Amino acid sequence: MNVLVRRKRNSVVVRSAARRYVLSVCMVLLSSVCAQSQSLQMDQKRFENSPILRDAAMAGAYYKLGVENLHEPSNSDRAIEHLEKAVELDESNGEYHYMLAEAYMANFEYAGLVRMPFLAPKVKSQLELAVKCDPISTVYREALVNYYVFAPAILGGSYQKAHEQSDQIARIDTYLGMLAHAGVYAGEGEGDKAEQLYRKAIYSRPGSWQAYHHFGNYYVGIGDLDAAIVMFKKYAEVAPDQAESHYQLGRAFQQKRMYPETIRSFQKALELDPSRTPLVFRIAQLYEFMGNRALAHEEYQHYLSMVPSGRAADDARVKIRELAH
């Protein structure tokens, strides 16, 4: 009997201890949850009371919207609107300035002759601000070099400034500096100097893709499409996972009027980067040009499913109606 009593008492003690343990664990967890909740509330209050944090978050949101719209050049007006707000909220972010410059350039096609002269200075200003915000970015400096090379003097173009920026790039990366200077020489009409630097860059880093990309564009510019295709094939070989390599190869094929090869290259670029929706529209146009109305109709519909609004979407609807008859 005493044994049974002791067993019951021991059982009660064990259950009581277990309940106390569970209760203590629950209290610890509850305390942790409360602390986290208070921390989140404090973070929220700190966010609400801090214009800097709030503006940075808003700027990031506008930036993302701008970049999304920039995927479709015909939506560049919307991209500009969002990216201008991002820059307004955070003027210290070089990427925001750079992408706003990209949006202005994308808008050139739709700006017309009257607005173009007003857009060019904005491109220059945003690129200069991007470089100021991030002086070690070779991407921003290269974009500024290209502006100085291609813009007329009245809009801020300057070969001297382009070479100066190329010198700055060379201080960061000798290889990229050679390519930048080569591009400036090409713009100046110094083809021999440009080609010499392109070849020197390839020799110094045969496994890097940038020289093949730049040299290919140079050949496109002087109308040597066969040489351009050779360079872009090499570009795609050393950078097979880059959508841009296949796009550039396709672009050269298109200028050579090698349309089946063009379509295959563009499809590969789309496979690697589905956000390149303008290529779907381009493929539809190529099929239409080749006389394949069924595939053209299919690709225009495909484009509309991806981009239901915008200038190009309106054009796609017109094409779908025309090809249906």
Where do the PLM segments sit?
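Residue-level recognition of tetratricopeptide repeat
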Residues: 67, 102, 109, 146, ...
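Canonical tetratricopeptide repeat
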Residues: 64, 99, 143, 180, ...
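Hydrophobic/aromatic packing residues within the alpha-helices of TPR/SEL1-like helical repeat arrays
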Residues: 47-49, 83, 127, 166, ...
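Structural marker of alpha-solenoid helical repeat scaffolds
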Residues: 54, 89, 133, 169-172, ...
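Register position in tetratricopeptide repeats
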Residues: 71-72, 106, 110-113, 150-151, ...
